[in-house]
Curated annotation (Swiss-Prot):
Gene Ontology cellular component terms for the protein in this record: cytoplasm; fungal-type vacuole membrane; membrane; PAS complex; vacuolar membrane
Gene from which the chain derives: VAC7
Localization (cell): Vacuole membrane
Protein name, as recorded: Vacuolar segregation protein 7
PANTHER family attached to this UniProt entry: VACUOLAR SEGREGATION PROTEIN 7
Length: 1165
C-alpha cells in the first residue's frame, strides 16, 4: 500500500480549539515538559486512524523492553521504529473507518478475559447522541470555548489510539470512580494488571503490545480526557522508502486524537461495558473494589452504606495515588526509549515539539486547578526531584518527559470539574443564536460565528533562553543547520456550534476535512519554565525531537552517535512562510505565535524566487527556500532563525505607531461580541458578520491609514501571474506582504546592516492581517469573486496652488520607477522613504512614452498643505525624517511626485473661481434667453394690432375716358406693430356728379348749356340767367355710378411704428374699366346712383327733348351715355368703401373704411 492510498482528502466543518491556557505555554515554574515519546491510550479510534495488526516479531521485543524497563540506545530505537514504520503488513485494509468504535479485537487479551469480560462492538446511542458527545460542541470542553466556521480542503490523516495511556490513567485510583468516566476505569485496570503480572507475564505483554506497535510505526500522540481543551492535530503518514525521490508534501504536526467525535463514541462503549464487567475483576474489601495491586477504588454504588468511611478512604487514597503516581515516573521513563518518534512530517515542525507544547499546556491547567490540594502538589514536586536523581544514568530528556507525563493525570479531576460548571448567560445566548442560524439550511445569508484564537495574543508569548539558543547555533555545522526547515501552522480551526441540531449534525457527518494546525512546539520555553531541569536535559530533548525534514536524513541519524545528534538541533521556533528571518546571534529573539494560516499544499507551491536567500559580507538575511523537490535548501553561510510576528502584535504596534491618525479601534466588533467582554472565564471575543465564509471582511476593510495600496487586487495578481511570478523594477508593490518581509530582528542599534545584492524589492511589515497576503492560504481571499476591486476610500480636496504637477516634465511613476533603481536598506530599523503610490502604478508604466500622458489611472492632486502633511507622515513612518540639532525637519529621499492614490471616490471638494463664473454665465444666459424669448413673444402679441387712423389723403392724376377711368389714391395710416402691413384687397365704389346734365322722368338727359344760349339770343338775357340759377339751386344735379373697384393695382404697405411711432403713407392706383356700363356695375351688386355727368339741368327744355323711350329701362342700367355727356364738363369724383388686410402671426383679417371726393376738370390741367 503506497502513501497515496493512505491519504484521504476530507472536507469538514473545521473546529477552533478551545482558547484556554493550554494553547500556548506560559511561564509557570510548575509546568513540566511532557514526554512526547510516550504514546497515550485512547478509548476509541480516530476518524482517519490506522490500526496496526499484532505482529509477534515486531512487537514482542518492544513489549518486553517496555515492561522490563530496558534502556536501548537511540540508534536501536530509531532503527526499530523505521523498520516497523515502512512495513506495509502492519496496516489494516480498512484504515479509514470513520465513526467505528473499538471492538474486542482492539483490546488486549488479558484485559478482555480477566477484567472486562466482553466489549460490545457497536453503540446503539452513538448516532443519536453524537452531538452530546461531540468534542466540537461547547458543553464538552470549556463552556467559553470558541468555534469558528470556515470551509477548506486539506490533506489530513490521524494516528490510532495509543495504549500507553494506561500508565497515565492509573495515577488517581481514589478519585477515578467518582469523577472520571467508566472508560478511564477500564484503562486504569488494564494498567494495574500489566504491573502486577510483572515483566515476564504474558498478559502484560499483551496489554502493552499495541502501544509498542503504535509507537514504532507512527509519531507520538498525546491523549487527554473528555474535558481536555487541546485542539486536534492530525498526523500524516510517512512515505515508503521507494518514494523518497518524489516531491515531498509538507504536512501538519501531531493531532490529539481525543478531540474527535469517534473517540467519544468508543468511550461510550467502554462506559457501558465496564459498568457490567468491572465488579467481576476486583475483590471487595470494606465496601469498595480493590485493584490487583492493592490500591482501593471506592465503589460509588456502595456509597450509601457507609458514607463517612468512603470520604475518609477517598482522601487517603488521593494522597496515596499522588505518591504512587510520582513514584511510577521511573517506570514510564523506560517506555520512552522504545516509543520515541521515528519520523516527523516533512517540512513541518517536530511532532514531539507539538506534543510538548500541548501536554505542557494541559499541565498548566493542572497546576492552576491543583492549587487547592497542597499535599498533592508537595508530593508531586518531591517526586519530580527524586525521579531526576534516580534516573541520572538515563537520558535527561526521558526523565523530563516522564515527569511531565505523570502530572498530566490530574487533568481527569480538573476537567470533570470544569465540565460540571454551568454555562453563563452569554454562552447560552450564543448557542441559541448559532442554533437559529444553523437551522435554516437553505439560508441565503450563510451567517457564521467567527472566533479569534488566543494563540495570536501577546499575553501568551513564550520567552526562550536566548543564551542557550545561541550556544546551539554556534555548535551546529552550517550544512546541518541549513537542512532544518520548520513550517509552523497556527492552531486556528473552526466549525459551526452544534447544540442538538440534527441538520448541522448531518452536515458534520459528510465528507469534509478538518483543518488543524500545530501548537507552538518550543521546547526551550518549556524547559525554561521548569527550574528542576538542568541544561543537559534540553540538549537531550533536542536529540529526540529534532525535525527530520527528509527521508534520507534517517540513515545519517541512525549512524551518528548521540553527541553528534546534539549538534543538529535548530533554533526552536515556529516558522511561517512569509515571516522574516535573520541570523544575528546577538539579537534577542522572542518566540511569537505564528501569523500565517497556510494550508499544507501551499507550502510546497510557494514561488522559489520569493523565497530566495541573499548573502553579503558574511551576514545573511534569508528566507526559507522551498524548492519543488524539497530535497535541500540553497546553501548559506549561516543558519537562519525565523521570527514570526503575530496578528495582534502587528496590530498593537501599528496602533501605537498610527495613534495620531485617529481612532484605531477595530470597527467590526458588534453587539454580540460585547456580551463576551465580561465573561470571567476568559473566553475570546466573538465577531459576528453576515458575509460568506470565503470573504475575510475584516482584512479587506481594515487598511492602513498611510498606505493607500489595496492588497490582493485582481489586476495585480493577474499582472504578477502573467509574468512568471516576477515583478519588474518599475512596479510599486511597496507594503505588500505577498513576498518575504525582511527586517533585522528589530535591532535598531545594529548599524552595520547587510546590503541586498539580488533582491528586486524591499518590503516592510505592515499592520494588516497576514491572512489576506498568503495567496496559497485557505483563508486567502483575492477579491476576484467581487464585482469590482475597490481600493482604499479616501477623500482629498483639489489642489488650488498647483506647483510641481504642472511642470511639463513631471512624471507620475513610483519610487521604483526611477532611473537609478537604487535599493536602500533600512537604517535604524526603518525603511527609506517611498512614493506613496497605489497598485495602479503599473498601468502607468515606466517608459518615457507614458511619463507625460494622463490617463484614467492618473490620480487627483492634493492641496499644498495636504501634500506636505502626507509627505511628513510617510517620511516619519519610513524613517526618512531626521531631527538635527536645531530641531529642523529635513526631508530626505522624498519624491516630489508624491501623489494621492487613485480612487473613484476622489473628487474636488471646492470649485475654482473660473468654474464659478462660468457656471454663473451659463445660468445667466439661460435665464436671459428665457426672458428675452418671453419678452419678444409678449411684445409681438402686444404690438400686432390693426391699422390706426387710416385716411385717403388725396386722389389725383385722374384720367377720364369713355372706356376707362384711372386715378391715384394716397392713403396714410399708423401701424402700432413691429412688422409691416400690406393692403391689396379693397371694396371701393366710384361715383361721378355733375350739374350740367338734365334728365327727365323717362331718363332722357340733355345738356342745359345749349338751351340757355338759345334763349339768351332770342329773349332778354336777365331773365335767362335768373331761370338758370333757379335750376341749379333747385337741385338739378345728376349723380352717376361708374362702377366698383375690388383690387388695387399696387398694394398699400404700412411700416411698423412700434419704436418710432410715426404715421406711414402709401400710394396706389385704382383702375375701372367701362365706367357706367352694366359689367362695371355688376362686379358689385350695389345699385348706387352715381353722378357722373357734369351738366346743367334746365327747366322744361331738356325734359321735353329727352322723353323717355320704349327702351328707357335698359338705358337706366346702362349709363354709358351719361358718362359720355359728363366727361365734357367738370364733375366731381367720389370714392367710398373699405380696405382689407391681415395682421402678422395672427392670420386674422381686418378692414377699415375710407371715403374721399375730388373735383375733376377735364379741359384743365
Amino acid at each position: 500500500m503506497t502513501e497515496e492510498d493512505r491519504k484521504l482528502t476530507v472536507e469538514t466543518e473545521t473546529v477552533e480549539a478551545p482558547v484556554a491556557n493550554n494553547l500556548l505555554l506560559s511561564n509557570n515554574s510548575n509546568v513540566v515538559a511532557p514526554n512526547p515519546s510516550i504514546p497515550s491510550a485512547s478509548t476509541s479510534t480516530s476518524p482517519l486512524h490506522r490500526e496496526i495488526v499484532d505482529d509477534s516479531v515486531a512487537t514482542a521485543n518492544t513489549t518486553s523492553n517496555v515492561v522490563q524497563h530496558n534502556l536501548p540506545t537511540i540508534d536501536n530505537n530509531l532503527m526499530d521504529s523505521d523498520a516497523t514504520s515502512h512495513n506495509q503488513d502492519h496496516w489494516h485494509s480498512d484504515i479509514n473507518r470513520a465513526g467505528t468504535s473499538m471492538s474486542t479485537s482492539d483490546i488486549p487479551t488479558d484485559l478482555h478475559l480477566e477484567h472486562i469480560g466482553s466489549v460490545s462492538s457497536t453503540n446503539n446511542n452513538s448516532n443519536n447522541a453524537l452531538i452530546n458527545h461531540n468534542p466540537l460542541s461547547s458543553h464538552l470542553s470549556n463552556p467559553s470555548s470558541s468555534l469558528r466556521n470556515k470551509k477548506s480542503s486539506l490533506l489530513v490523516a490521524s494516528n490510532p489510539a495509543f495504549a500507553s495511556d494506561v500508565e497515565l490513567s492509573k495515577k488517581k485510583p481514589a478519585v477515578i470512580s467518582n469523577n472520571m468516566p467508566t472508560s478511564n476505569i477500564a484503562l486504569y485496570q488494564t494498567a494495574r494488571s500489566a504491573n502486577i503480572h510483572g515483566p515476564s507475564s504474558t498478559s502484560a505483554s499483551k496489554a502493552f503490545r499495541k502501544a509498542s506497535a503504535f509507537s514504532n510505526n507512527t509519531a507520538p500522540s498525546t491523549s487527554n480526557n473528555i474535558g481536555s481543551n487541546t485542539p486536534p492535530a492530525p498526523l500524516l503518514p510517512l512515505p515508503s522508502l521507494s518514494q523518497q525521490n518524489k516531491p515531498k508534501i509538507i504536512e501538519r504536526p501531531t493531532m490529539h486524537v481525543t478531540n474527535s467525535r469517534e473517540i467519544l463514541l468508543g468511550e461510550n462503549l467502554l462506559d457501558d461495558t465496564k459498568a457490567k464487567n468491572a465488579p467481576a475483576n476486583s475483590t471487595t474489601h470494606d465496601n469498595g473494589p480493590v485493584a490487583n495491586d492493592g490500591l482501593r477504588i471506592p465503589n460509588h454504588s456502595n456509597a450509601d452504606d457507609n458514607e463517612n468511611n468512603n470520604k475518609m478512604k477517598k482522601n487517603k487514597n488521593i494522597n496515596s495515588g499522588k505518591n504512587e503516581r510520582n513514584d511510577d515516573t521511573s517506570k514510564i521513563c523506560t517506555t520512552s526509549t522504545k516509543t520515541a518518534p521515528s519520523t516527523a512530517p516533512l517540512g513541518s515542525t517536530d511532532n514531539t515539539q507539538a506534543l510538548t507544547a500541548s501536554v505542557s499546556s494541559s499541565n498548566a491547567d493542572n497546576h492552576n486547578n491543583n492549587k487547592k490540594k497542597t499535599s498533592s502538589n508537595n508530593n508531586g514536586n518531591n517526586s519530580n526531584s527524586a525521579s531526576n536523581k534516580t534516573n541520572a544514568d538515563i537520558k535527561n530528556s526521558n526523565a523530563d518527559l516522564s515527569a511531565s507525563t505523570s502530572n498530566n493525570n490530574a487533568i481527569n479531576d480538573d476537567s470533570h470539574e470544569s465540565n460540571s460548571e454551568k454555562p453563563t448567560k452569554a454562552d447560552f445566548f450564543a448557542a441559541r443564536l448559532a442554533t437559529a442560524v444553523g437551522e435554516n439550511e437553505i439560508s441565503d445569508s450563510e451567517e457564521t460565528f467567527v472566533y479569534e484564537s488566543a494563540a495570536n495574543s501577546t499575553k501568551n508569548l513564550i520567552f526562550p533562553d536566548s543564551s542557550s539558543q545561541q550556544q546551539q547555533q554556534q555548535q551546529q555545522p552550517p550544512k546541518q543547520q541549513q537542512q532544518q526547515q520548520n513550517h509552523g501552522i497556527t492552531s486556528k480551526i473552526s466549525a459551526p456550534l452544534l447544540n442538538n441540531n440534527k441538520k448541522l449534525l448531518s452536515r458534520l457527518k459528510n465528507s469534509r476535512h478538518i483543518s488543524t494546525g500545530a501548537i507552538l512546539n518550543n521546547t526551550i520555553a518549556t524547559i525554561s519554565t521548569n527550574p528542576n531541569l538542568n541544561s543537559n536535559v534540553m540538549q537531550n530533548n533536542n536529540n529526540l525531537m529534532s525535525g527530520h525534514n527528509h527521508l534520507d536524513e534517517l540513515s545519517s541519524i541512525k549512524q551518528e552517535p548521540p553527541h553528534q545528534l546534539q549538534q543538529q538541533q535548530p533554533p526552536m521556533d515556529v516558522q511561517s512562510v512569509d515571516s522574516y528571518t535573520s541570523d544575528n546571534p546577538d539579537s534577542n529573539v522572542i518566540a511569537k505565535s505564528p501569523d500565517k494560516r497556510s494550508s499544507l499544499v501551499s507550502l510546497s507551491k510557494v514561488s522559489p524566487h520569493l523565497l530566495s536567500s541573499t548573502s553579503s559580507n558574511g551576514n545573511t538575511i534569508s528566507c526559507p527556500n522551498v524548492a519543488t523537490n524539497s530535497q535541500e535548501l540553497e546553501p548559506n553561510n549561516d543558519i537562519s532563525t525565523k521570527k514570526s510576528l503575530s496578528n495582534s502584535t502587528l496590530r498593537h504596534s501599528s496602533a501605537n505607531r498610527n495613534s495620531n491618525y485617529g481612532d484605531n479601534k477595530r470597527p467590526l466588533r458588534t453587539t454580540v461580541s460585547k456580551i463576551f467582554d465580561s465573561n470571567p472565564n476568559g473566553a475570546p471575543l466573538r465577531r459576528y458578520s453576515g458575509v460568506p465564509d470565503h470573504v475575510n471582511l475584516e482584512d479587506y476593510i481594515e487598511q492602513p491609514h498611510n498606505y493607500p495600496t489595496m492588497q490582493n487586487s485582481v489586476k495585480k495578481d493577474e499582472f504578477y501571474n502573467s509574468r512568471n511570478n516576477k515583478f519588474p523594477h518599475g512596479l510599486n508593490f511597496y507594503g505588500d506582504n505577498n513576498v518575504i518581509e525582511e527586517e533585522n530582528n528589530g535591532d535598531s542599534s545594529n548599524v552595520n546592516r547587510p546590503q541586498h545584492t539580488n533582491l528586486q524589492h524591499e518590503f516592510i511589515p505592515e499592520d494588516n492581517e497576514s491572512d489576506e497576503n498568503d495567496i496559497h492560504s485557505m483563508f486567502y481571499y483575492n477579491h476576484k469573486n467581487d464585482l469590482e476591486t475597490k481600493p482604499l476610500i479616501s477623500d482629498y480636496g483639489e489642489d488650488e496652488d498647483v506647483d510641481d504637477y504642472d511642470r511639463p516634465n513631471a512624471t507620475f511613476n513610483s519610487y521604483y520607477g526611477s532611473a537609478s533603481n537604487t535599493h536602500e536598506l533600512p537604517l535604524h530599523g526603518r525603511m527609506p522613504s517611498r512614493s506613496n503610490n497605489d497598485y495602479y502604478d503599473f498601468m502607468v508604466g515606466n517608459n518615457t512614452g507614458n511619463n507625460n500622458q494622463l490617463n484614467e489611472y492618473t490620480p487627483l492632486r492634493m492641496k499644498r498643505g495636504q501634500r506636505h502633511l502626507s509627505r511628513t507622515n510617510n517620511s516619519i513612518m519610513n524613517g526618512s525624517i531626521h531631527m538635527n540639532g536645531n530641531d529642523d525637519v529635513t526631508h530626505s529621499n522624498i519624491n516630489n511626485n508624491d501623489i494621492v492614490g487613485y480612487s473613484p471616490h476622489n473628487f474636488y471638494s471646492r470649485k475654482s473661481p473660473f468654474v464659478k463664473v462660468k457656471n454663473f454665465l451659463y445660468l445667466a444666459f439661460v435665464i436671459s434667453s428665457l426672458l428675452m424669448t418671453g419678452f419678444i413673444l409678449g411684445f409681438l402679441l402686444a404690438t400686432n394690432k390693426e391699422l390706426q387712423d387710416v385716411d385717403v389723403v388725396v386722389m389725383d392724376n385722374v384720367i377720364s375716358s369713355s372706356d376707362e377711368l384711372i386715378f391715384d389714391i394716397t392713403v396714410s395710416a399708423f401701424n402700432p406693430g413691429f412688422f409691416s402691413i400690406s393692403v391689396s384687397q379693397v371694396d371701393l365704389d366710384i361715383f361721378a356728379k355733375s350739374s350740367y346734365l338734365k334728365c327727365d322722368s323717362n331718363g332722357d338727359c340733355t345738356v342745359m348749356e345749349q338751351e340757355r344760349k338759345i334763349l339768351q339770343i332770342t329773349t332778354n338775357l336777365s331773365l335767362v340767367e335768373e331761370s338758370a340759377n333757379n335750376d341749379i339751386s333747385g337741385g338739378n344735379i345728376e349723380t352717376v355710378l361708374l362702377g366698383t373697384a375690388k383690387k388695387l393695382e399696387t398694394p398699400l404697405k404700412f411700416q411698423g411704428g412700434a419704436f418710432n411711432r410715426n404715421y406711414d403713407v402709401s400710394v396706389s392706383s385704382v383702375k375701372l374699366l367701362s365706367p357706367g356700363s352694366r359689367e362695371a356695375k355688376h362686379e358689385n351688386d350695389d345699385d348706387d346712383d352715381d353722378d357722373g355727368d357734369d351738366g346743367d339741368d334746365e327747366n322744361n327744355t331738356n325734359e321735353r327733348q329727352y322723353k323717355s323711350k320704349p327702351n328707357a329701362r335698359d338705358d337706366k342700367e346702362d349709363d354709358t351715355k351719361k358718362w359720355k355727356l359728363l366727361i365734357k364738363h367738370d364733375y366731381e369724383l367720389i370714392v367710398r368703401g373699405s380696405m382689407k388686410y391681415e395682421v402678422p402671426f395672427f392670420n386674422t383679417q381686418k378692414s377699415t373704411a375710407i371715403q374721399k371726393d375730388s373735383m375733376v376738370h377735364p379741359g384743365k390741367k
